[in-house]
Every structure is written in structure tokens, then in C-alpha cells.
């Protein structure tokens, strides 16, 4: 089979104005960025507030292997398949970070015959949103240090300057650095570091803005940025972006980034790509604003949440839907035979290395043995009152007995049904079975009532424990002395009613990436607690948090080049 880049190069692309018409977006709200990309003027939401909302479909997954299970590819393929059966559909996705693109994970734009095009434009810069986030973030960091340097009128504790610089690249050498060296004219020395750009709280803020129109969204962006905690004073009180007088400039830098980006799939289905927070360290969902636009335009909006249902989907319900006044009509859980076999605990999948030979051999018993993970993830979504469909992303080595094993696991666990998906190799045609099942499930009239996991007024520690018990399968939580003190301080400071955004590994339902399947009875440890006051959530941290990825021995960047005609080669 051809590479994704080769397939993308041969695709027939429609001008972005045609895609806007196909979406149902009046062209006066389209701001073209070249021939095949555009941004959407948010006055559309002001002028079309009375348009009925379409159906809303969440795409999630089982706990993934390091290779991923094709969730984005499935979401794109489902939207294309719905169009094939006569439903006007759109897919909403997060924007790719350049770090993983040139690292090892890939671009997050699908693959094969189920991808976003033009591929290179979609994963390399797009319309400049990540640059805007980076610039605004680093401006805030500079203003924070500048306030400390010029007499420190805010009494900033230099050991508690929280904001670090960001850059959109995987570079472990930047995790810990010394700045301010070379004498007083260059500042004061202190230890800090860099995070990858999409780990910036500004990216989380961009995804959480829910204003019902252009002016409302801009006001909300400005207010959220102003609440960002950039440092602490010597007395322990927070210093905000407003305090360092940087919120206005940051908002100016991000004002265009507030507008969702319009692109297309390889079958010319509209795609909205906007915001890109990671799911293991932030909320891991595309923007509320993009979904609000999509729901006012299309009959079906397909949106993807990062990693497994225990992470991205839980945050989708408790954070994104709560903030945006949204609720899905159905959810799709993507599974693969190879991942379920891996959850049996018998196989080790390592990114960048060949799959174990035994993993590719027929063995339905191992599928059943690893099926507990699928069962748990189905339960994780059905407890929100949302019907679940399982999409089996198939590979050539999958056998009929293994596929039947997945179907039995899915239906016994409470899924409405399972559909085989082959969108990577066959495009929308390979997702028609899934599209028909999703359309049938969403036929019930009227919106579904939100069913959150916890009320906001519940104490912070109890909210954390509810997630650990009901989503992860833990027997309880253990707060370190530091975490307990931080929770008390946050509650006393008036942040006790904020929702929870857990920070944990995506490779296990637990805090331990080595625990496969559906572990139970463990104690979930909370090492420390942070706050994203601008994004509007509390961040309990389990285990080690890496906010600046590193490169492997053979990063994807080694394969990327350009030919004499200007064509990119080796990207995917």
C-alpha cells in the first residue's frame, strides 16, 4: 500500500469555499488562508444562534499501545462514511504539534485513505495557531521575569515562578536550564525549563473558550488569560497574568487563533481543526468553539478525545461538555485485536520496534484475556448515560475468530453493537457499517441530559477519588503530604468548586504504565496538585509528568526531506 503522504499527494482537493458550502457555512464567514485552508469568523455563532444543533458523536478508544489504535483515522473515516450514506457530517480534531510529527508518534491527521488534506499543511504550522500560543506564552514568561527584575513590585518569589518558556519541538535538553547568566544586565540567574508549546495553559484555554459569539469569545479569552497563575508571592498568594500586565498583549497575539480552522478530508468532507492540548497533562480535546460551529452547520459532528476513554473521554464529559453546554448522542470506542492481545499481558509493544511475531498469529483466547480493558472502557462511557458503539479497526492479520471475540466482548459489556472498520485502506467505504450503526443509535429524538461524574461543589479530594474509583478501578487514593496541603490551600483560596483534570499515564487505566488490562484494587497516588486557573481546572498529578518530550534514537525527522520540485518526502 502507498504511504499516507503519497496517497495525500494524489488526492483531489476542492477549493476551501466549496468545502464551506458543503459544511453549510455561508461564505461570508469564511476567511481563506490560501486555496485549501481557511478560518471561520465567529460572528457566525452570533448570527445563527437559533439554528438547531445536529447530532454529536464522541470517538474514544481502549487504553492504547504506544503505536496508537487509529482513533483519529476512525473519526475521519466515520465522518466520510456518514456522508456516503446521505448524512451531512463534519469531523472536529485537535491541531498537530510539530514535536510528535518529527518525533515518533506521528501527526494526528489520520492516515491512509482516511486523512486530512493537504497533509503537510495540516500538520506543519496549519494557520499559525501554535505559533500564536507560543508567542503569547513566552511574552507572559518574559513579563513575569521582567517584573521580578525591575524592583519586584509584586514581591514574586523567584523560586516559585511557575511559568516556563515553550517551544514546539521535542527536546529533552531544554527540560532543565539556567537563565539570567552573564551578569545583572542579563537578569538574575535561576533554574527553569522549557515545555512543548501545546503543554501551555494558553492552549488549554483556547480549547475551553465557549463564548456564544465573536465578542463573547474574545472577552472570555481575555478573562481566562488574566486568571492564569504565573508565579507566587513570598507570602504564598498567586501572581496572575493580569498582575504582570500581560493578559492584554497575550490576547492580542491569540485573537486570530481563536477562530477555528477549516480543512477537508481526502474525500472532501469538511474538517474543523482547532486547539491541541495533550490529554495526559491537560483536557485532550479540540475546541468547544469548533464544535459549536460544527453543530450549527452539520447533521453529524464527529469529535475525537485523546488517548483512552479513561483520560480523553472522562475529560470530554466533565470538562469540555460542562464548560460548553454540550452532550453527545453516542460514543464510539475504537479497539484493535493487537491492542486487546497486548492487554492480556503476554506481549510487549515498543514504539519504533517491530511487533512481536506471536502477536500477529491467530489467538482469540488472548483477545478474551485482554478484553477486560474494553469492558472497563465501555463501562466508563455508559455510566455517563451515553450509548456506546465499538469500532474494530482491523488489520490484514486479524482473523474471523478474533473479530468475533471482540464482538462478543463488546455486546456482553453493554455496547449497542460492534462494527468492523477498514477506513485506513478503503476510506469512507470501509466505514459504512459503522456509520449505519451510529446513525441508528442516534435516531432517538431530543437531546440527552448531562450526567456528570461529580457535582462541582463536592470537595476536591472527593472529586479526585470519584474519578479514581469509578473510572480507573482504584480502591482509593493516597495524597502525599504536599498534595494534601496544596488541596487545602486551593480550597481556602476559593478554587474548591473547579473540576478535576487528572494528570497520569495514558498507557494504563492505573497510574502505572506497566499495568495492562483492567487493574483493580490498587491505591491511586497523588504526588502533587497544580492549578490551571485560566483553563478552569485543578490538576492532580500521579507519577512523573513530562511536559517536554524527547527524541528517540531514530526520530521521524531523519526520514523527512524535499525533492527538486519542492515535494515533501518521508513525512509519513
UniProtKB/Swiss-Prot annotation:
Which pathway does it operate in?
One-carbon metabolism; tetrahydrofolate interconversion
Q: Which reaction does it catalyse?
A: (6S)-5,6,7,8-tetrahydrofolate + formate + ATP = (6R)-10-formyltetrahydrofolate + ADP + phosphate
Give the matching Pfam families. Answer: FTHFS (PF01268)
- Specify which residues bind ATP according to the UniProt entry for this protein: 65-72
Domain of life from the UniProt record: Bacteria
Q: What is its EC number?
A: 6.3.4.3
Q: List the CDD domains hit by this protein, alphabetically.
A: FTHFS
Q: In its UniProt record, which GO terms are filed under biological process?
A: tetrahydrofolate interconversion
**Keywords linked to the UniProt accession:** ATP-binding, Ligase, Nucleotide-binding, One-carbon metabolism
Molecular function terms from GO: ATP binding; formate-tetrahydrofolate ligase activity
Give the family, as the similarity comment puts it.
Answer: Belongs to the formate--tetrahydrofolate ligase family.
Q: What is this protein called?
A: Formate--tetrahydrofolate ligase
Report the source organism. Chloroflexus aggregans (strain MD-66 / DSM 9485)
* Name of the gene encoding the protein in the UniProt record: fhs
Amino acid at each position: 500500500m502507498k504511504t499516507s503522504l503519497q496517497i495525500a499527494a494524489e488526492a483531489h482537493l476542492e477549493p476551501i469555499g466549496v468545502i464551506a458550502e458543503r459544511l453549510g457555512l455561508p461564505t461570508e464567514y469564511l476567511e481563506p488562508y490560501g486555496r485549501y485552508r481557511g478560518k471561520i469568523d465567529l460572528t457566525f455563532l452570533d448570527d445563527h444562534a437559533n439554528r438547531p444543533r445536529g447530532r454529536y458523536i464522541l470517538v474514544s478508544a481502549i487504553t492504547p499501545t504506544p503505536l496508537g489504535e487509529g482513533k483519529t483515522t476512525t473519526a475521519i473515516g466515520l465522518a466520510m462514511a456518514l456522508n456516503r450514506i446521505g448524512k451531512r457530517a463534519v469531523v472536529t480534531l485537535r491541531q498537530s504539534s510539530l514535536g510528535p510529527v518529527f518525533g515518533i508518534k506521528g501527526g494526528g491527521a489520520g492516515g491512509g485513505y482516511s486523512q486530512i488534506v493537504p497533509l503537510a499543511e495540516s500538520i506543519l504550522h496549519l494557520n499559525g495557531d501554535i505559533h500564536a500560543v507560543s508567542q503569547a506564552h513566552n511574552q507572559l514568561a518574559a513579563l513575569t521575569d521582567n517584573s521580578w527584575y525591575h524592583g519586584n513590585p509584586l514581591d514574586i518569589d523567584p523560586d516559585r515562578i511557575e511559568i516556563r518558556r515553550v517551544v514546539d519541538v521535542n527536546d529533552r535538553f531544554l527540560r532543565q536550564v539556567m537563565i539570567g547568566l552573564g551578569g545583572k544586565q542579563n537578569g538574575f540567574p535561576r533554574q527553569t525549563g522549557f515545555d512543548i508549546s501545546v503543554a501551555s495553559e494558553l492552549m488549554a484555554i483556547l480549547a475551553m473558550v465557549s463564548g456564544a459569539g465573536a465578542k463573547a469569545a474574545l472577552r472570555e479569552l481575555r478573562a481566562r488569560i488574566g486568571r492564569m497563575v504565573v508565579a507566587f508571592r513570598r507570602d504564598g498568594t498567586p501572581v496572575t497574568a493580569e498582575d504582570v500586565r500581560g493578559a492584554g498583549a497575550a490576547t492580542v497575539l491569540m485573537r486570530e487563533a481563536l477562530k477555528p480552522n477549516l480543512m477537508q478530508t481526502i474525500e472532501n468532507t469538511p474538517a474543523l481543526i482547532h486547539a491541541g492540548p495533550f490529554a495526559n497533562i491537560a483536557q485532550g480535546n479540540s475546541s468547544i468553539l469548533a464544535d459549536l460551529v460544527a453543530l450549527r452547520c452539520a447533521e453529524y459532528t464527529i469529535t475525537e478525545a485523546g488517548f483512552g476513554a479513561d483520560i480523553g473521554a472522562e475529560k470530554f464529559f466533565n470538562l469540555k461538555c460542562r464548560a460548553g453546554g454540550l452532550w453527545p448522542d453516542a460514543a464510539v470506542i475504537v479497539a484493535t485485536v493487537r491492542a486487546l492481545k497486548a492487554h492480556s499481558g503476554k506481549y510487549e509493544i515498543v514504539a519504533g520496534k517491530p511487533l512481536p511475531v506471536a502477536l500477529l498469529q491467530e489467538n482469540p483466547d488472548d483477545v478474551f484475556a485482554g478484553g477486560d480493558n474494553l469492558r472497563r472502557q465501555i463501562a466508563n462511557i455508559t455510566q455517563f448515560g451515553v450509548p456506546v458503539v465499538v469500532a474494530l479497526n482491523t488489520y490484514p492479520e486479524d482473523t474471523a475468530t478474533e473479530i468475533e471475540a471482540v464482538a462478543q466482548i463488546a455486546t456482553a459489556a453493554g455496547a449497542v453493537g460492534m462494527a468492523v472498520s477498514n477506513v485506513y485502506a478503503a476510506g469512507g467505504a470501509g466505514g459504512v457499517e459503522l456509520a449505519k450503526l451510529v446513525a441508528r443509535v442516534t435516531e432517538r429524538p431530543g437531546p440527552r441530559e448531562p450526567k456528570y461524574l461529580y457535582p462541582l461543589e463536592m470537595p476536591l479530594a472527593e472529586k479526585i477519588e470519584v474519578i479514581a474509583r469509578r473510572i480507573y478501578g482504584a480502591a482509593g487514593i493516597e495524597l502525599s503530604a504536599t498534595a494534601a496541603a496544596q488541596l487545602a490551600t486551593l480550597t481556602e483560596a476559593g478554587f474548591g468548586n473547579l473540576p478535576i483534570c487528572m494528570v497520569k499515564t495514558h498507557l494504563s487505566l492505573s497510574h502505572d504504565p506497566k499495568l495492562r488490562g483492567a487493574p483493580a484494587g490498587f491505591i491511586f497516588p497523588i504526588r502533587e496538585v497544580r492549578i490551571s486557573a485560566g483553563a478552569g481546572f485543578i490538576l492532580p498529578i500521579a507519577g512523573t509528568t513530562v511536559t517536554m518530550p524527547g527524541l528517540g534514537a531514530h526520530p521521524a525527522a531523519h526520514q523527512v526531506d524535499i525533492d527538486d520540485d519542492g515535494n515533501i518526502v518521508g513525512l509519513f
